[in-house]
Amino acid sequence: MAKVSAVEKNKRRKMMVMRYAARRARLKAIVMDQKISLEERFKASVQLAELPRNSAKVRVRNRCEVSGRPRAYYRKLKMSRIALRELGSVGYIPGIIKSSW
């Protein structure tokens, strides 16, 4: 199990990303638009830099929903390889069976 504080910190980051997503996208579009004057683009980049760091999507870490483990994460299932193996062998994940040949 991951530390509860690390999992909670990641949840707060996810919420902050959702809260600032529209504002960040709007400012980023202004900064990237070559048709807008350089002064306006610079103002937008300053405003973008003033946003909280944790509102950036890259600061969020994919974590297992079951254990909170940050590594060996399967995106489709939103869980780590260890949780996948444990829950799959018990039969809690539909369509997952232990292979044998």
From Swiss-Prot:
Protein source organism: Bartonella quintana (strain Toulouse) (Rochalimaea quintana)
Keywords per UniProt: Ribonucleoprotein, Ribosomal protein, RNA-binding, rRNA-binding
Name of the protein described by the UniProt record: Small ribosomal subunit protein uS14
Keyword Ribosomal protein in annotation: yes
Biological role: Binds 16S rRNA, required for the assembly of 30S particles and may also be responsible for determining the conformation of the 16S rRNA at the A site.
UniProt GO MF annotations: rRNA binding; structural constituent of ribosome
InterPro entries according to UniProt: Ribosomal_uS14, Ribosomal_uS14_bac/plastid, Ribosomal_uS14_CS
Keyword Membrane: no
